[in-house]
């Protein structure tokens, strides 16, 4: 018989652990030995912070993968925004979950793995966005010469906003609206993009005036400090802005992707203010110079016109010379008019004298006598004409009265009454037929209802089974042993209890 001493058993000196004990021991060992580590790797599976503010992703290289988590408090302290594929150095501690035997790193600090990694990522992003046309010079907008309102996207505290406001006040005082944002850290990019989009959505006639030009500004810093302005959402927001944008991020030697998307790049925030507004003193001097030039030009113009008018006046003849010929013509016309009036008056006098001789008193008296005779004849004919007219109208009225005899009306009334009596008889007959038809239909439906009801089935010797709730039992599978049932026959109900295994022979099979 073979010995089983080679198998671990109760007599072995190896300690025995439960699953939870060995998991807890591993957790303590890992956390004690790796309580503070620095891990270099590439960010994988990053989807941004969770709704809770925590971020879950993994660090990987070409041979392994390590799960990672950044709690909300540590996430807010990051100086840059993590991105998929970025190589970073994470500082934190390893921990395990005994319930699943998995381990991960809880990151307390994280930074890009050198400027080289960031520059490689920046160059890749630059090439990709340029291929989309976001840096196309044809999209650049001209800055307004004299804006009314300037929008500034920057930190509300610090020297940048003070320099911009001070420079604008010195050059050309106007209204400045500041949209406060964080200019460093994980939330820098989203906040700047939100500010640019927010300014673009302001209505022209709203309580907050829409800016005519935007300045996105930040002081100098390292590549990591300025990384938020390389964010893709910032570049897209600036490229899509309908308001001209001046980028003033970092010093003159610094550059970010927002510089390529903006309509104008300023070396410093102060330079951006100088680009945005002109110098008021220069405008006043230019206006004064142009006003003086205009006044001088107008003086020369009027002098030239005055000299031209004088030369023209000297070339013109005198008033007596101009009016001599018209005056002569007027005198000749007046002389001819006097003679013509005298001749015309003589002709009219001769004409009127001829008519006056025809209007003698005897002629007028004869005309009046003729008119009186005509009036008398008309007065004699008028009574006869009136009598004839009245006689004619009386005859017409008598004829119409004879036509309005009551006999036709009485005949029409009797005919209408007869028609109404016939309609009454037909109505009564139709109602009786309809009532009989409804009665017959009701009797047919009643017979059909009795035929289809289950009472007619009971009359033929069948029965209906109901359960304890009074519902019909349609299948045997719905009945369990010892169920209380009710069987309804033609003449009443009988209570029964279901029994398992009891089978009644089918009487039809023996026939």
UniProtKB/Swiss-Prot annotation:
Function noted in UniProt: Bidirectionally degrades single-stranded DNA into large acid-insoluble oligonucleotides, which are then degraded further into small acid-soluble oligonucleotides.
Record keyword tRNA processing present: no
Gene Ontology biological-process entries: DNA catabolic process
Keyword field: Cytoplasm, Exonuclease, Hydrolase, Nuclease
The species this protein was found in: Brucella ovis (strain ATCC 25840 / 63/290 / NCTC 10512)
Pfam family, one: tRNA_anti_2
UniProt xrefs under InterPro entries: Exonuc_VII_L, Exonuc_VII_lsu_C, OB-fold_nuc-bd_dom
GO cellular component assignments: cytoplasm; exodeoxyribonuclease VII complex
Similarity-based family: Belongs to the XseA family.
CDD domains the record matches: ExoVII_LU_OBF (cd04489)
Subunit structure, interactors included: Heterooligomer composed of large and small subunits.
UniProt GO MF annotations: exodeoxyribonuclease VII activity; nucleic acid binding
Gene name of the record: xseA
PANTHER family for this protein: EXODEOXYRIBONUCLEASE 7 LARGE SUBUNIT (PTHR30008:SF0)
Name of the protein described by the UniProt record: Exodeoxyribonuclease 7 large subunit
Cell location: Cytoplasm
Catalyzed reactions: Exonucleolytic cleavage in either 5'- to 3'- or 3'- to 5'-direction to yield nucleoside 5'-phosphates
Enzyme Commission identifier(s): 3.1.11.6
Keyword Nucleus: no
């Amino acid at each position: 018989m073979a010995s089983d001493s080679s198998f671990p058993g109760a007599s072995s000196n190896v300690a025995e652990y439960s699953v939870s004990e060995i998991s807890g021991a591993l957790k303590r060992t890992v956390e004690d030995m790796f309580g503070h580590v620095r891990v270099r790797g590439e960010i994988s599976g990053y989807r941004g912070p969770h709704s809770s503010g925590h971020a879950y992703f993994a660090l990987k290289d070409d041979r392994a993968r390590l799960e990672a988590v950044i709690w909300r408090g540590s996430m807010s302290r990051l100086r840059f925004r993590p991105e998929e594929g970025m190589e970073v150095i994470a500082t934190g501690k390893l921990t395990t979950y005994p319930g699943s035997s998995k381990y991960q790193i809880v990151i307390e600090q994280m930074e890009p793995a050198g400027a080289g990694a960031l520059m490689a990522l920046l160059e890749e992003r630059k090439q990709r966005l340029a291929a989309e046309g976001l840096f196309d010079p044809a999209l650049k907008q001209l800055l307004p010469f004299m804006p009314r309102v300037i929008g500034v996207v920057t930190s509300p505290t610090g020297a940048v906003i003070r320099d911009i406001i001070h420079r604008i006040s010195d050059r050309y005082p106007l209204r400045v609206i500041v949209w406060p944002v964080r200019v460093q850290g994980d939330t820098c990019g989203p906040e700047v993009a939100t500010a640019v989009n927010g300014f673009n959505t302001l209505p022209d006639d709203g309580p907050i005036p829409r800016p005519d030009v935007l300045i996105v500004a930040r002081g100098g810093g390292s590549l990591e400090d300025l990384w938020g302005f390389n964010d893709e959402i910032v570049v897209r927001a600036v490229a899509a802005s309908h308001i001209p944008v001046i980028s003033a991020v970092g010093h003159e030697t610094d550059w970010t992707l927002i510089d390529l998307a903006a309509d104008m790049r300023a070396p410093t925030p102060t330079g951006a203010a100088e680009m945005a507004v002109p110098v008021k003193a220069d405008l006043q001097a230019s206006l004064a110079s142009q006003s003086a030039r205009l006044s001088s030009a107008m003086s020369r113009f009027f002098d030239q016109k005055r000299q031209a008018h004088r030369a023209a006046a000297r070339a013109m003849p005198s008033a007596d010379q101009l009016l001599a010929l018209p005056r002569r013509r007027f005198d000749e016309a007046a002389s001819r008019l006097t003679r013509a009036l005298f001749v015309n008056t003589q002709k009219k006098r001769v004409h009127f004298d001829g008519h006056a001789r025809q209007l003698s008193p005897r002629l007028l008296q004869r005309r009046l006598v003729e008119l009186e005779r005509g009036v008398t004849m008309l007065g004699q004919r008028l009574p006869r004409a009136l009598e004839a007219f009245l006689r004619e109208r009386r005859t017409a009225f008598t004829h119409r009265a004879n036509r309005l005899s009551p006999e036709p009306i009485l005949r029409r009334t009797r005919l209408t009454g007869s028609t109404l009596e016939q309609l009454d008889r037909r109505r009564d007959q139709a109602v009786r037929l309809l009532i009989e038809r409804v009665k017959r239909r009701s009797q047919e439906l009643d017979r059909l209802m009795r035929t289809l009801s289950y009472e007619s089935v009971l009359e033929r010797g069948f029965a209906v089974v109901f359960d304890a709730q009074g519902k019909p039992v349609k299948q045997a599978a719905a009945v369990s042993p010892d169920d209380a049932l009710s069987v309804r026959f033609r003449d009443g109900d009988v209570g029964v209890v279901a029994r398992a295994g009891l089978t009644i022979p089918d009487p039809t099979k023996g026939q």
